[in-house]
């Protein structure tokens, strides 16, 4: 057991000291290496692609934090079961959406630009990226990350100027109002 810990320690230390930019770049490169050249295959085998997306997102996203953020002020009054159920449903919705996007969006290149802005807090970072479509149009993407348990985790994404976290929070708030604040109906 001690030998195994000694062998794993450098890998764990590397993961904990990896910069936000390196974490995003490594995750994207690893994921894309699994699907590049196999787009037609995955278009016909969506469950396999979903499994890859799930694995990739689980490595980088803080779904518990994202779920709490999307629930906003409603999070405090939700039961632990309601919080957990929402986080699971939200996570699956993101995986399904991302999977469909991978199959339908025609892109040529993904460029991680790096950490561009100074942050107010040491446990927060932003990493910018560009998605270059086949027609040459460039879509900016900005990942917001926070340091949690020694690892950088994605907590929000802004795509082409649209803040997804804020959009989902507004949708959740509206759904709660439409359903008389019934967590189970939302």
What feature does the model see in each segment?
Residues 17-98:
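Early exported N-terminus immediately downstream of N-terminal targeting peptides
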Residues 138-166:
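Short beta-strand edge/turn micro-motifs at domain boundaries
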Residues 75, 92-93, 133, 160-164:
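Solvent-exposed loop/turn segments at secondary-structure junctions
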Residues 1-2:
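Bacterial N-terminal signal peptides that target proteins for export
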């Amino acid at each position: 057991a001690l030998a195994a810990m000694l062998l794993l320690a450098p890998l764990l230390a590397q993961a904990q000291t990896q910069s936000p930019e390196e974490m995003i770049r490594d995750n994207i490169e690893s994921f894309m290496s699994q699907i590049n050249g196999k787009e037609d295959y995955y278009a016909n085998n969506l469950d396999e692609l979903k499994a890859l997306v799930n694995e990739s997102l689980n490595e980088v996203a803080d779904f518990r934090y994202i779920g709490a953020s999307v629930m906003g002020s409603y999070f405090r009054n939700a039961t632990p079961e309601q919080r957990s159920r929402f986080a699971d449903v939200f996570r699956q919705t993101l995986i399904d959406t991302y999977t469909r996007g991978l199959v339908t969006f025609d892109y040529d290149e993904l460029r991680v630009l790096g950490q561009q802005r100074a942050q107010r807090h040491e446990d927060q970072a932003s990493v910018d990226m560009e998605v270059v479509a086949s027609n040459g149009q460039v879509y900016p993407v900005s990942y917001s990350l926070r340091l949690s348990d020694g690892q950088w985790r994605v907590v929000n994404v802004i795509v082409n100027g649209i803040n997804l976290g804020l959009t989902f929070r507004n949708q959740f708030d509206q759904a709660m109002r439409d359903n008389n604040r019934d967590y189970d109906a939302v």
